[in-house]
Amino acid sequence: MEYGEEPPIKRTRRSFLMLPDDLVLNCLARISRLHYPTLSLVSKTFRSLLASTELYQTRILLGRTESCLYACLRLRTDSELLHWFILCHRPHSSKNVLVPISSPSFTSPSLPGVVVVGPDVYAIGGGSKNKNVSIYATGSKTYNALSSVMIMNSRSHTWHEAPSMRVGRVFPSACTLDGRIYVTGGCDNLDTMNWMEIFDTKTQTWEFLQIPSEEICKGSEYLSVSYQGTVYVKSDEKDVTYKMHKGKWREADICMNNGWSLSSSSSYCVVENVFYRYCEGEIRWYDLKNRAWTILKGLGRLPSLPTSHSNVKLADHGGKMAISWEEYMFVDREKKIWCAEIAIEKHQNGEIWGTLEWFDNVFISKTPNGYVGLVHALTATVW
């Protein structure tokens, strides 16, 4: 160094974690939760921060709510276990992928009813071959009906037990309205007393909803949905949809009834108070004014969907529609799961159009014969 020359500046490498904790949490809280699984791989410190109560509280203060899509899969290697996944961004890519999260430890050869209330996912009832509880028969299969209820907190992805139902239910149908869960059917010998149970998520208590007519409760399997501020229920026994009106049940519009059936279970959803359903490659919405099911226009870029209803799941995704479906690859003997997100626009002339925002292959099975079953797809609101 020559005389009079300034000494070189010694550069020090600074870490993001050298910032004050409050500032670090503020930065992380502004990042979408879809990136959290990738960020948790950076270090133990990041992993701890992302799971902290402080980050959760910071997101609440900033109003950082977002919708997270969860999928429940059944794999043939352990066909009675249900595996849960969350949709996340793939590292170093703009694509999305299903990432496994913790799953409840109990097994269920039948499918529990699943609903979401805020950030909590409820898995209700189901069937077991091992527990000595009430018996339920359907077709050639016999199940032990479970009354248990499990709750997953979508912030921590941990499961815990909730108060059990009063009646065991193998294939219950469930929907939510104003913070209450309405559970219908799923057991034999239903009567006006046990046809439906209601769970108050605030008080964590169950109560039966008594109905005046046994005609309504004939059957064991049902579809149910919260729509237009009330609860609609459809029975497998009678091709009739009932709706609750001022505390009483009455038959719903016949045109609406014709648009959904048990063969298309879970292939329907309500977005912004509009009822949508999937049928034979088309998504339709119920035009309440004209009492007709109308094709959702604008989806020309959406890949062809399977014609089997059970392979397609619709879900309200924060005011948009999430579509999940299966595809079997005969050459590779693999099963793929795809997801798409549809933005919905209501026009002044009463029409509703959809716009495809993205679609990705989010899961490829690695099990023998490429088997994987898409059981549920639903969205939770997370801070």
UniProtKB/Swiss-Prot annotation:
The record ties this protein, via Gene3D superfamilies, to: Kelch-type beta propeller
SUPFAM superfamilies in UniProt: F-box domain, Kelch motif
Keywords in alphabetical order, please: Kelch repeat, Repeat
InterPro entries reported in the protein's UniProt record:
F-box-like_dom_sf, F-box/kelch-repeat_ARATH, F-box_dom, Kelch-typ_b-propeller, Kelch_1
Q: Which residues form the F-box domain?
A: 13-59
Q: Which SMART domains match?
A: FBOX, Kelch
* Keyword presence, Methyltransferase: no
Spans of the Kelch repeats?
Answer: 134-179, 180-226, 267-316
User: What is the protein name stated in its UniProt record?
Assistant: F-box/kelch-repeat protein At4g23580
Taxonomic source organism: Arabidopsis thaliana
